[in-house]
Amino acid sequence: MDYKNYNPRAAALAQARTLLTDAVKAAIADGTLPEAALPDFIVEIPADVKNGDIASNVAMAGARAFHKAPRQIAEAITAKLQLDGSLFDRFEVAGPGFINLFLGQDWFTSVVRAAVANPEYGRTDVGAGKKYNVEFVSANPTGPMHMGNARGGALGDGLAACLDWAGYDVTREFYINDAGNQIEKFGKSLAIRYLQLYKGEDACPLPEECYQGADIIARAKEFAAVHGDAYVGKDFDELKKAIVADALPKNIEGLQRDLGKYRIQYDVWFHESDLHNSGAVKAVVDKLLETGACYKAEDGAIMYRSAQYAAKYGVVNKRKTEDGSEEEAKDEVLVRANGIPTYFAADIAYHYNKLAVRGFDKAIDVWGADHHGHVARMKGAMDAIGLDGSRLDIVLMQMVNLMRDGKPVRMSKRTGKAITLTDLLDEVPIDSARFFFNQRESSSTLDFDLDLAVRNDSENPVYYVQYAHARICSVLKKLESEGITFNGVDGVDAAVLTDPTEQALIRLLAAFPAEIVAAADKYDPARITRYCIDVASAYHRFYNACRIMDAEGAVQQGRIALCLAVRGVIRNILTMFKVSVPETM
């Protein structure tokens, strides 16, 4: 059997639906059930295995159509169920008319064999042929990255991994905001700090709206170390241009270095400035004018009918302005009266580039939840320009609370400033950071326990799953030292694995490909970290209940296969999230 892209749970659910549908048709054909269209029905994994491996409400769903009691319908359906040659070996009718199906040992055997034989067990091809772009972090290159960027980096990279494992062609992208008001403010801040080095702070006060950080002073000093006072007497705009040209590439290199340390490798670093320099922003604005989505105001500004197009994607009562405040939604400026485009215009051009120019089937952006007001207007803009706004999906991410001794931590011990990504990675292992940030759904606020992240015991979830992997490696090494080897997957027979912990572990292993698909579909990599913890827990229960070294024959071979299967699943998950996979601890 070819185990590539094998999804045991999906196969069982699909076959159960087919068997039940065929049984209904057979019951109608012989008159046991009256002629009627079968309504939609559910096949699902019940919470309690006592209720079967697959349960269905098909009889209850058909009660109105067939004008019979659900239990009667269930008995008519099960009388026609053809289980010979299927994945199932028995059924039962339960309660008011549920039909419960029980999987046969061949299915359990196939799960173990697949998880051992396929080094990429869990990978599926549901997304084959579809190109997805995942843009995340995209921090302003004007200063250091904060905790939101730290969470967004781990979350975006984890989401991209889930999509990749579900078969999508994934591009990881960072959007460099190297144009517009932020860069103007960056240049002004740098230039004033440079002038202060020679004229003093009283002669050159730094306005409150400028960047106040020590990193700005450091960059100004670096510029002065090379150029001295050569720019003191020059035009201020010339100074700004020169000092930005010196500092901005260094900041971008710093972002790349810090994200690389965080084990994030992007496929594309896309510069906002390229959109302006290439004429892409102007082209998009012209296109919107042609469609009537934009119009020229009396002062010459080009206005976009934002509320009209955003309405279908949610309530847009307020929007965030460029200075960070909120105002009532209305027609928005895309090009100012002075001819300078707004950030929103560049953002529309950027997403048009993703979906129309580069042809991604989906563009997925990971944003902080404070940008929620921008979601509907951005999706609406895609409609306005002739694309489908549903091809743009936004993952909104809630804030991070750093905790120590049960109390919030807001300042770095080292710098006395707000904690940056670099500060975090200096304090906690990268493994912990990447795993912890992927333990909660993006829509939930995350409390990051700094004390827990450095603990080397089972309370630390990443240590817990790494230890399960290392324990398996130790078991296999001990078996090898005793001359006990695995004879290959063809000899594995799950029928001998009858202990409840063995059966539970196999069922859990079977869920891995389906969990990958669900995580990709729901943009929720936290499903996989939670699943990984469940697998580690199930393995520890199995290890404590079932002897491996002292077992014999087929039982021992089956248990060795279970060890190999669990090791492979944990290895694949940790590798997906770029967490180290130790063989000894």
Which ranges hold each PLM region?
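Short, charged, solvent-exposed linker or helix-capping segments at domain edges/interfaces
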Residues: 110-115
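Non-catalytic interaction-recognition regions
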Residues: 2-109, 120-585
